[in-house]
Swiss-Prot record:
Primary enzyme class: transferase
Binding site for ATP: 181-186, 209-211
Record protein name field: Acetylglutamate kinase
Originating organism: Salmonella typhimurium (strain LT2 / SGSC1412 / ATCC 700720)
UniProt site (Transition state stabilizer): 8, 217
Amino acid sequence: MMNPLIIKLGGVLLDSEEALERLFTALVNYRESHQRPLVIVHGGGCVVDELMKGLNLPVKKKDGLRVTPADQIGIITGALAGTANKTLLAWAKKHHIASVGLFLGDGDSVNVTQLDEALGHVGLAQPGSPKLINMLLENGFLPVVSSIGVTDDGQLMNVNADQAATALAATLGADLILLSDVSGILDGKGQRIAEMTASKAEQLIDQGIITDGMIVKVNAALDAARALGRPVDIASWRHAEQLPALFNGTPIGTRILA
């Protein structure tokens, strides 16, 4: 089996039928012309935000990471492992892709511990066991994995989806693409940066050009590139016509170098 490709989905993608249609069309085209196994990892911040708003619950973030109190982890699990995950499975079904919905704890695929008590039920993801997902891939299934994990003592944890995808890529020896709303990392003039190193990233963070959630994304990609010993791509799902090329290894966004 070729080494898998993990496609991490994020941003408002889950809110846009047009974007999902384009993405799954690109996935079908890619699967028809390539034997390479694919895995989807997703967050779903927009789904969670909508639900929290509907329930009049405050959304708090610290350093770009969502604060998850004990009384909210059930709601967030329902949104991510439930609504967001099953929405993607429904799209896969519509496009005749045999898929399986998972969370990080299934088959101990990703090991999770609490990241920081101040963040509540927010988990740190570490590589786990490849056995379950490899079995699914060998049988032609598309695993769709939500970024909810569970600790050894049975506590549910909300994990940053970029970090979850990184840990799963390390588990499977997979290549990683982080798909988001933006076409990559932009410089101070709004131009896409084709390649990024750790020192360049630090410089742009110090200058205030890379901020908030993008800092988390860049750090996750740098961590992934280091852990995997290979480049990681950050790109946009908006350019659907370019996605098959991206899945095939052609950079269309920002390539993060270890």
